[in-house]
């Protein structure tokens, strides 16, 4: 596992240190798949970074077997503002807005499969469209107070909101054919002709899926240095609200017969209806100590700590002791 300060993460951790520009700077790039730009501003007490990206893989999706009008678009904006009014205080704001839209109007699909002696051809003609939306908003504000060079306290508040919707109504009419391989008069090239129609049919797919989630978090953390020890602690309160609604169904009609067939009449091949809502609170704390010492072998770092968390949704309390030992060999310290 990982250090106690990293929460309940046991398989992966993303620990980011944000860049602080030292002067006015910027960059930009443009390609067939999108564009990006960055601007950094710096004064004696303030730094501000801004970045924006736009991407589209419309040209890549055009090479798929299913032909149609693909219109995928992704855009996001990130900002980081840091203000240091004095040697003791540091205030920062981090924000992120991202939106991913996927619009698709399928037209037809043409696929061949099988072996050299048994070739199949699958054709589908579509009507309808799909519209998907994924939007995320994230913001964090923090204030750090340094009592001295060895002790500091940080208050932090953050909020996260996401909205996802998947909607489509698509009808497809398909033909499955068997192909015969023949030889031209000169005997140099093989040509394929449709010899038999194995199956025809129609299917309809419908979906109205919506998901919204909100997470609010408030925390206080502290850091204290005592000679070779670095003591860190923290407490956190988090509220999570999730709303999920799914409506999906699929109808299949093979050669004029609705599938599946029952004695009570035609039924849908697949259907899904669900509605879920959760409103829960999480409480957590951690305490850990990092001790560094040298020997002839190199620099050792011993980290040990405890973490506790409680989730009122399942009334479960988790207590997690953690420890790790790292070594930088002496020949690597140079």
Show where each model-derived region lies.
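Transmembrane beta-barrel wall of Gram-negative outer-membrane proteins
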Residues: 27, 31-54, 67-106, 130-161
């Amino acid at each position: 596992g990982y250090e106690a300060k990293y929460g309940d993460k046991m398989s992966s951790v993303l620990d980011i240190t944000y860049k602080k520009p030292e002067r006015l700077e910027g960059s930009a790039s443009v390609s067939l798949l999108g564009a990006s730009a960055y601007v950094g501003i710096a004064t004696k007490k303030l730094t501000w970074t801004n970045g924006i990206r736009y991407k589209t893989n419309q040209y890549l999706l055009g090479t798929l077997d299913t032909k149609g009008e693909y219109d995928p678009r992704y855009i996001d904006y990130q900002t980081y503002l840091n203000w240091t009014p004095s040697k003791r205080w540091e205030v920062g704001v981090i924000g992120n807005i991202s939106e991913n839209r996927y619009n698709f109007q399928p037209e037809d699909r043409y696929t061949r499969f099988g072996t050299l002696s048994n070739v199949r051809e699958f054709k589908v003609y579509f009507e309808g469209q799909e519209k998907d939306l994924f939007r995320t908003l994230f913001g964090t504000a923090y204030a750090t107070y340094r009592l001295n060079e060895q002790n500091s306290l940080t208050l932090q508040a953050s909020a996260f909101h996401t909205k996802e919707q998947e909607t489509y109504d698509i009808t497809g009419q398909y033909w499955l054919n068997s192909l015969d391989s023949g030889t031209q008069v000169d005997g140099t090239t093989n040509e394929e002709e449709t010899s038999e129609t194995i199956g025809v049919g129609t299917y309809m797919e419908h979906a109205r899926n919506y998901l919204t989630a909100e997470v609010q978090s408030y925390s206080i953390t502290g850091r204290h240095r005592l000679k070779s020890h670095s003591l860190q602690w923290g407490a956190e309160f988090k509220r999570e609200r999730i709303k999920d609604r799914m409506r999906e169904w699929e109808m299949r009609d093979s050669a004029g017969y609705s599938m599946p067939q029952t004695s009570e009449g035609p039924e849908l091949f697949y259907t899904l209806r669900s509605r879920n809502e959760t409103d829960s609170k999480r409480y957590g704390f951690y305490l850990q100590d990092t001790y560094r010492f040298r020997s002839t072998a190199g620099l050792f770092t011993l980290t040990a700590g405890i973490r506790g968390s409680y989730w009122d949704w399942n009334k479960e309390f988790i207590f997690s002791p953690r420890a790790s030992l790292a070594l930088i060999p002496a020949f690597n310290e140079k």
